[in-house]
Amino acid sequence: MHHRNDSQRLGKAGCPPEPSLQMANTNFLSTLSPEHCRPLAGECMNKLKCGAAEAEIMNLPERVGTFSAIPALGGISLPPGVIVMTALHSPAAASAAVTDSAFQIANLADCPQNHSSSSSSSSGGAGGANPAKKKRKRCGVCVPCKRLINCGVCSSCRNRKTGHQICKFRKCEELKKKPGTSLERTPVPSAEAFRWFF
């Protein structure tokens, strides 16, 4: 019987619906549609890029407790009620959350550049001091290059699991030479080179 009265009360045209039911019937988050949030988020990012993030943070206490403060938080995945409650109870925490998330968004935008520069510098290895250096390749015509299998007895073959060096009997003659010795130089004995000092 009590349920009928509630349903009759809702069905009456003359009675205005209760405020809680009215809130449930209408979308109270309609102001936060994606079309409205995107321009605000873009505006926030433009301010961050221009260095005017401080101005946005200074204006925060005026906006604390309103739904318009939510897009400035940078898309935190908490429900809107939790953010609003946090902002209402502690404006300092809300401004800290805005600054943290704003800088987090800015840092995420910079991440691909940082990762690409660090990976290119770390891939150089031990000889990465001069990035213009080309990797030396085997000639393919000398006797060690023509050998197809490892010997299995040299130190490089025995340490195959830990070391990454080629078999000593398969190492190219060109690679045995140091890169700077490709020019023909006559060897000079050390005593004769400094004979004019004595």
Curated annotation (Swiss-Prot):
It comes from the Eukaryota. Its main location: cytoplasm. Residues 161-166 are annotated as: Interaction with DVL1. One of its GO terms (biological process) is zygotic specification of dorsal/ventral axis. A zinc finger (CXXC-type) spans 132-173. One of its GO terms (molecular function) is methyl-CpG binding. It is found in: Cytoplasm. The keyword Zinc-finger applies. Transmembrane segments: none annotated. Zn(2+) 1 binds at C139, C142, C145, C172. Zn(2+) 2 binds at C151, C154, C157, C167. Interacts with the PDZ domain of DVL1. The CXXC zinc finger mediates binding to CpG-DNA. PANTHER family: CXXC-TYPE ZINC FINGER PROTEIN 4, ZINC FINGER-CONTAINING. Acts as a negative regulator of the Wnt signaling pathway via its interaction with DVL1. Binds preferentially to DNA containing cytidine-phosphate-guanosine (CpG) dinucleotides over CpH (H=A, T, and C), hemimethylated-CpG and hemimethylated-hydroxymethyl-CpG. This is CXXC-type zinc finger protein 4. It comes from Homo sapiens. The lineage of its organism: Eukaryota, Metazoa, Chordata, Craniata, Vertebrata. The gene is CXXC4.
